[in-house]
C-alpha cells in the first residue's frame, strides 16, 4: 500500500464512493444576447445561452480538420506551440466552467491528466499547467514522451510547478475513482488512425470502467473521428478545438464546449465553419 501511495504522488489513499463526487452547480456558461440559439433571461436579468449552436456550427471530417490545421500553420504562420498553448488554456477553462473547484468535494480537487504521444498530449500538458493555476491538483500520466524540444519544455514547465508525473497507470478503475475527482483524456486527437496499441489499449480499458467524470480533449480517445464509438469511453465533457469533429454528433455527455478562439475570419469563411460568437473575452463557448 505504501508503494501505491508513493507511486500516485498523493499522501493518502482516500476511500470513497465510486460515484462522481461533484456537488450540485448552476449553469456554467452564460453570455450576452446572440442569434446563436434559443435563449432566456435568468432571474438576474442576464441572458442564459443554455441551448447552443450544435445544429448550426459545422462538424468537420478528418480531412477537413487536417486541412484547416495545415492552413493555420502554413498560410497564417501559427506555430505549433502557439496553438497548443491557446488550446490547452481553452481546455482548462472549459473544465473550470463544467467542474468549478467549489463544486468538488475535495480542496483542491484532484485531477488525473493522461497524455498521449502527439499534439493532443501536448494540449493535455498545457491544460494541466493551467488547471494548477486555477486551483486544482493535477497529476499527469505521460507514458510515451516524444523526444522533441517542445514536449520536453512542456514537461519541464509542469515539473517546475510541482505537478507530479506517475510512473505507471493504476490498473484498477476503482483506484482512480478513489484518488481523483476527474480524469482528462488527452491521449489521441483527430489525426489518429489505425488500431490502438499498448499501453493505450489497456489505459482505455481502465477508463471505460470509471465512475468519475472523464473530460476528453477534441476527440474521445479510441473513437473514429467521423463515426464515433458506442463501445468506447463515454466522456462527461467534450472540448472540441477549432471546430467540432463529426464524431461529436455521437457525444451523449452533459457538457460540450468549443475552444480555441484563434481562427482567422477569412479561414472560417473559406471552410464555412459557422463558429459561434464567443461572448466578450471568453476563450470557450458551450455548445451543449
Curated annotation (Swiss-Prot):
Post-translational modification, as annotated: Undergoes physiological phosphorylation during sperm capacitation, downstream to PKA activation.
Segment annotated as transit peptide: 1-47
GO CC field: cell body; cilium; cytosol; extracellular exosome; extracellular region; extracellular space; mitochondrial matrix; mitochondrion
A Pfam cross-reference name: YjeF_N
Domain YjeF N-terminal: 65-275
EC category: isomerase
Tissue: Ubiquitously expressed, with highest levels in kidney, heart and liver. Present in cerebrospinal fluid and urine but not in serum from healthy patients. Present in serum of sepsis patients (at protein level).
The keyword Mitochondrion is annotated on this UniProt entry: yes
Reactions that this protein is recorded to catalyse: (6R)-NADHX = (6S)-NADHX; (6R)-NADPHX = (6S)-NADPHX
Keywords, in A-Z order: Disease variant, Isomerase, Lipid transport, Metal-binding, Mitochondrion, NAD, NADP, Neurodegeneration, Nucleotide-binding, Phosphoprotein, Potassium, Secreted, Transit peptide, Transport
Binding residue positions for K(+): 120, 185, 221
E.C. no: 5.1.99.6
Cofactor(s) required, per the database record: K(+)
UniProt xrefs under SUPFAM superfamilies: YjeF N-terminal domain-like
Major subcellular site: mitochondrion
Cofactor note: Binds 1 potassium ion per subunit.
Organism superkingdom: Eukaryota
A single GO molecular function term of this UniProt record: nucleotide binding
Keyword match Transmembrane: no
Subunit annotation: Homodimer. Interacts with APOA1 and APOA2.
Function: Catalyzes the epimerization of the S- and R-forms of NAD(P)HX, a damaged form of NAD(P)H that is a result of enzymatic or heat-dependent hydration. This is a prerequisite for the S-specific NAD(P)H-hydrate dehydratase to allow the repair of both epimers of NAD(P)HX. Accelerates cholesterol efflux from endothelial cells to high-density lipoprotein (HDL) and thereby regulates angiogenesis.
UniProt disease link: Encephalopathy, progressive, early-onset, with brain edema and/or leukoencephalopathy 1: An autosomal recessive severe neurometabolic disorder characterized by severe leukoencephalopathy usually associated with a trivial febrile illness. Affected infants tend to show normal early development followed by acute psychomotor regression with ataxia, hypotonia, respiratory insufficiency, and seizures. Disease course is rapidly progressive, leading to coma, global brain atrophy, and death in the first years of life.
NCBIfam families, per database record: yjeF_nterm
Protein name (Swiss-Prot/TrEMBL): NAD(P)H-hydrate epimerase
Species of origin: Homo sapiens
Gene label: NAXE
Amino acid at each position: 500500500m505504501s508503494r501505491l501511495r508513493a507511486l500516485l504522488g498523493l499522501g493518502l489513499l482516500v476511500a470513497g464512493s465510486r460515484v462522481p463526487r461533484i456537488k450540485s452547480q448552476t449553469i456554467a456558461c452564460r453570455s450576452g444576447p446572440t442569434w446563436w440559439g434559443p435563449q432566456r433571461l435568468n432571474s438576474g436579468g442576464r441572458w442564459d445561452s443554455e441551448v447552443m449552436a450544435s445544429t448550426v456550427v459545422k462538424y468537420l471530417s478528418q480531412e477537413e480538420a487536417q486541412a484547416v490545421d495545415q492552413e493555420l500553420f502554413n498560410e497564417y504562420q501559427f506555430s505549433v506551440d502557439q496553438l497548443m498553448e491557446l488550446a490547452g488554456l481553452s481546455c482548462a477553462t472549459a473544465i473550470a466552467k463544467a467542474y468549478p473547484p467549489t463544486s468538488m468535494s475535495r480542496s483542491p480537487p484532484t485531477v488525473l491528466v493522461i497524455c498521449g504521444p502527439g499534439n493532443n498530449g501536448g494540449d493535455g500538458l498545457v491544460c494541466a499547467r493551467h488547471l494548477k493555476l486555477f486551483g486544482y491538483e493535477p497529476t499527469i500520466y505521460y507514458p510515451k514522451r516524444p523526444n522533441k524540444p517542445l514536449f520536453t519544455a512542456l514537461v519541464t514547465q509542469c515539473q517546475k510547478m510541482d505537478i507530479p508525473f506517475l510512473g505507471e497507470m493504476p490498473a484498477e478503475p476503482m483506484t482512480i475513482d478513489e484518488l481523483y475527482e476527474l480524469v482528462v483524456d488527452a491521449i489521441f486527437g483527430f489525426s489518429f488512425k489505425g488500431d490502438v496499441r499498448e499501453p493505450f489499449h489497456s489505459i482505455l480499458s481502465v477508463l471505460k470502467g470509471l465512475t468519475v467524470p472523464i473530460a476528453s480533449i477534441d476527440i474521445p480517445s479510441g473513437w473514429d473521428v467521423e463515426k464515433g464509438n458506442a463501445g468506447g469511453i463515454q466522456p462527461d465533457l467534450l472540448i472540441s478545438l477549432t471546430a467540432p469533429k463529426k464524431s461529436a454528433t455521437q457525444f451523449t455527455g452533459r457538457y460540450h464546449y468549443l475552444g480555441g478562439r484563434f481562427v482567422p475570419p477569412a479561414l472560417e469563411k473559406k471552410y464555412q465553419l459557422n463558429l459561434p460568437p464567443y461572448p466578450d473575452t471568453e476563450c470557450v463557448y458551450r455548445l451543449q
